[in-house]
Amino acid sequence: MQYKIKIRDSTTPELLDSFFEHAWTYRKPVKFVIDVTECKRVSLGRILSMKGVLDKHRPNSRRYIDHSEVIVRSRWARRLLSIGLGIIRTERPVYISTPT
């Protein structure tokens, strides 16, 4: 099952938490497709602010996520996200792409 999430500058950790909670209700393997192309304020601090949410959902991530794809708008955002994910240490593979 593919679960799409659109992240904007206004997305809070609480909203991201609700997206994950909803995805787990299906109790099926899932591939997250996270679109962050509308974010204009990308920073390492903002990426790391989501760590608490990801830590909370680690048990379900191990159980249900096959892999995730994050779509970013620039090579700079791709590099920054790659650094942030290295610090966070995700449970499953995360592939980062730019729109073509």
Residue ranges and their predicted role:
Residues 1-100:
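Amphipathic, Lys/Arg-enriched alpha-helical "gate/interface" segment within cytosolic domains
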